[in-house]
Amino acid sequence: MHLQNSDTQALELQANTLTWQAWQTFWASHLGKEVLKVEAEYLAPIMESLRGYHVLSVGSCPSKPLLENCTIKHQMEWRPNFDLAEHGSCLIADPSHLPLPNDSMDVVLLHHSLEFFDRPHALLKEAARVTLPKGELIIIGFNPRSLWGLTRLLPKGLQAEPLQVLKSAQFISQNKLLDWFEFLDLKQEERQLFFHRPPCNHQKPLERLAALDKRLGKKNWPLAGIYLLRIKKRVGSPLRPIVKKPSPSWLPAQPVSSPTRTSLKIQKEK
């Protein structure tokens, strides 16, 4: 076991920040806005059904539209650095070494983050570690067996600017995810496939093709562009971090009002 040296931490921070900023270009595009809108619609009933005290979002964009209907009031979200933290409930850390206790989160949302980071398996393991037994992980990602998966194979010069971020993204197959879930003692309980429109960044064609989503939206067509997974953490041996975590800086989250369970205490770094 060893501590990450300061040079490694600095490089990872810089890489995460640059990747985050590249994804913001995508989410600000016509296509990105439409994707986020549809994802929020599919997440809404799930968020309304959640129970617990603490939810953590690790993703490639601000989580406000995704957590809008969440019944869990104590909400934290990851950011790559302090400059990108909009409020006091942002967690600033290497996402594969979260400064959180084992079994401390009722729900962890991974929104396109397995595609975002260089070590998706390490991120998933860390998310599982901080999730309570019988807690939930919710994973949203792009389906590699779709037009979205084919688009990332195009030469960079043929891709529209908002889509260039997909070139470096890691599209992970369902079979590989199932292998990871088994290794981490996780059980997939629900899988939804949606967004049947091609990755086209033109507003009018996107609006015209919206009928495809209405026609195929609830059929889990295997070539749909986006998947949503609900994962349950089984009760078993606790997962431990691979290495001893450094002491990263983070902003403290606001405490939950009147909890019946001891609230998570995160101390501000001095």
Please tell me what each predicted stretch does:
Residues 121-136:
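A short glycine-rich, Lys/Arg-flanked "PGG" loop and its adjoining helix->strand segment in the class I
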